[in-house]
């Protein structure tokens, strides 16, 4: 049966016991929420550790019985028959514990800024961007998260040329972070009279929502411009300069916001997006430096990388990073089966982490 770092397990169990004891004392409501959240994360792994140790003890007893010359043949045969299943159970529990002990991404519990932009393919790309947004909106709803569109530029035939939304909920970044990249669709557009399959694309960016303490943005580094909000075809939709464009001069990152009639609200939303983009750009730079000699095929997060193809004629979705194909496109694009892709990507990423840990890197 696989071995585990017993000292780490003891620390984990001690932390769990300390939290349970502290819950019995007089604590603030805020502290109570923090503790119950941590306990809910620890409970499954603590149970796995206790079960693993019980299996380990049972295997030791069986091995002693098998090795004992005084054990009769029938009992030895029963013990030898029972041991493989126990060993497999122990290995299964050990793997679960190893995954739980992996270093956590500090951003995993953050809310998310979700940005979807139509790419090549004209109106069809905008329609596809709309499909992707609804897919994530439905998936978020199934997780109990809240989705709020902050900025949207609608396509001529529907969908979106670009949409930015905030996804609020526990573990939003952990679930959605592998969705960044180019999503490609192959289907026959409604406007296609010859029945030909067209290929279009949309780019998805998933950014952990940055807090003010994460990014130091100096006022002198910002160029802030106000203007009248523009409607379809360039018409003015109001007579006040409520639209805001903020440029972060050092990075060249630009955010335009005009969805609210309130300049104050547009400015706050623009700063929130700008903060997340600057923070994400720095994280991307650091991650690129760290992975210069080691490629994580799932977690690269390269926005120019084609990560997934949605083929409507064949009813399939293929994730190119892990070579996984699901023949349930309607369920995936509806958001109901998206979790199957996300779970597979998470498992692959964890396997890569475990391999790195095992290699002593």
From Swiss-Prot:
- HAMAP family, per database record: Rel_fac_1 (MF_00093)
The protein in question is named Peptide chain release factor 1
- Its encoding gene is what? prfA
The record, for Gene3D superfamilies, names: 3.30.160.20, 3.30.70.1660, 6.10.140.1950
Query: Which PROSITE patterns does the entry link to?
Result: RF_PROK_I
* Keywords associated with the record: Cytoplasm, Methylation, Protein biosynthesis
Cited InterPro entries: PCRF, Pep_chain_release_fac_I, Pep_chain_release_fac_I_sf, Prokaryotic/Mito_RF, RF-1
What post-translational events are described?
Methylated by PrmC. Methylation increases the termination efficiency of RF1.
The UniProt entry, under Pfam families, shows: PCRF, RF-1
Q: Which species does the entry assign this protein to?
A: Nitrobacter hamburgensis (strain DSM 10229 / NCIMB 13809 / X14)
Record's keyword annotation contains Cell cycle: no
Per the record, its GO cellular-component terms are: cytoplasm
User: Which family does the record claim for this protein?
Assistant: Belongs to the prokaryotic/mitochondrial release factor family.
**Its job:** Peptide chain release factor 1 directs the termination of translation in response to the peptide chain termination codons UAG and UAA.
Superkingdom, according to UniProt? Answer: Bacteria
Q: List every position bearing N5-methylglutamine.
A: 235
Q: Where is the signal peptide?
A: none
Q: Where in the cell is it found?
A: Cytoplasm
Task: Please list where the region (Disordered) is annotated.
Answer: 288-307
A molecular function annotated in GO for this UniProt entry is:
translation release factor activity, codon specific
